C-alpha cells in the first residue's frame, strides 16, 4: 500500500480506521500513520484547512470534505444516498466541487444487479443518481463557482455523456437563475487525470 511504502499519513474517521485495521487484504497498517478525524471538527494540513462532514452512506463512518486555503474552497461529496440542508451548507460558496453522479435510475432498474443491490444503491444510504446530483448542484450554484466535476460513475449503470446531459438538464430546468453553460461542468475520468483547474 502506498501509505505504508512511503510513510504517507492517512486522515480518517475512527470507524473507517477500525474497518481498515480489520481488513486482512490491506496487510499490517502502521498505526502511527493513521490520524483520526471527527465530523464537523476542522483540522489542518500545512496551509490547508479540512472540514469533514457526515454523509449518509452504508459504510464505516464515511465523510465528505470541504477543503479551504485562504479565501478559496473545494468540496468533495461522493457516496451519498441523499442530500439534505446540512450537506448543502457544507458545499455552499465553493470555487470547485466534485459531486457523485453514480447512476441513471432506469439503467439501474433494468440492469443485471440483484434486487437487494439495486435497493441498496437507490436507498437513502446508497448513491446519488444523475438527477439528484443535478438537483444538489442547483442548490449550491453561485456566481463564483469555477468548476464542477461529476464523479464516482457506475460502469454498469451510467455513461459519461448521460451523466453530463442529465445534470445539465437539471440545472437548466431547475428553479435557479443559472444555466449549465454558465459553469464548467465535466465528468471526472476513472482512468485518467482530469483537467487541472486553478481556483
Positions of PLM-derived features:
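Active-site HxH/HxHxD metal-binding segment of metal-dependent hydrolases
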Residues: 1-41
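Short active-site oxyanion
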Residues: 5-10, 73-74, 183-184
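A short helix-to-beta-strand connector/capping loop
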Residues: 27-34, 46-48, 179-184
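Core dinuclear metal-dependent hydrolase active-site scaffold
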Residues: 37-96, 196-199
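Cap/insert and terminal regions of metallo-dependent hydrolase folds
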Residues: 85-185
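Short, basic/aromatic-enriched C-terminal tail that caps enzymatic domains
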Residues: 183-199
Amino acid at each position: 500500500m502506498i501509505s505504508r511504502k512511503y510513510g504517507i499519513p492517512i486522515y480518517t474517521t475512527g470507524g473507517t480506521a477500525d474497518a481498515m485495521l480489520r481488513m486482512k487484504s490491506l496487510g499490517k497498517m502502521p498505526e502511527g500513520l493513521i490520524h483520526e478525524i471527527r465530523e464537523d471538527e476542522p483540522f489542518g494540513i500545512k496551509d490547508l484547512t479540512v472540514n469533514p462532514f457526515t454523509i449518509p452512506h452504508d459504510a464505516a463512518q464515511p465523510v465528505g470534505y470541504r477543503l479551504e486555503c485562504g479565501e478559496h474552497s473545494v468540496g468533495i461529496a461522493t457516496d451519498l444516498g441523499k442530500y439534505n440542508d446540512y450537506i448543502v451548507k457544507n458545499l455552499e460558496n465553493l470555487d470547485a466541487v466534485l459531486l457523485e453522479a453514480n447512476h441513471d435510475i432506469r439503467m439501474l432498474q433494468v440492469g443485471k444487479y440483484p434486487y437487494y443491490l439495486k435497493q441498496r444503491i437507490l436507498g437513502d444510504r446508497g448513491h446519488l443518481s444523475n438527477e439528484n446530483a443535478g438537483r444538489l448542484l442547483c442548490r449550491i450554484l453561485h456566481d463564483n463557482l469555477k468548476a464542477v466535476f461529476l464523479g464516482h460513475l457506475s460502469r454498469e449503470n451510467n455513461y459519461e455523456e448521460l451523466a453530463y446531459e442529465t445534470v445539465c438538464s437539471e440545472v437548466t430546468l431547475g428553479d435557479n437563475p443559472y444555466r449549465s453553460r454558465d459553469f464548467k461542468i465535466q465528468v471526472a475520468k476513472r482512468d485518467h487525470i482530469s483537467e487541472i483547474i486553478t481556483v
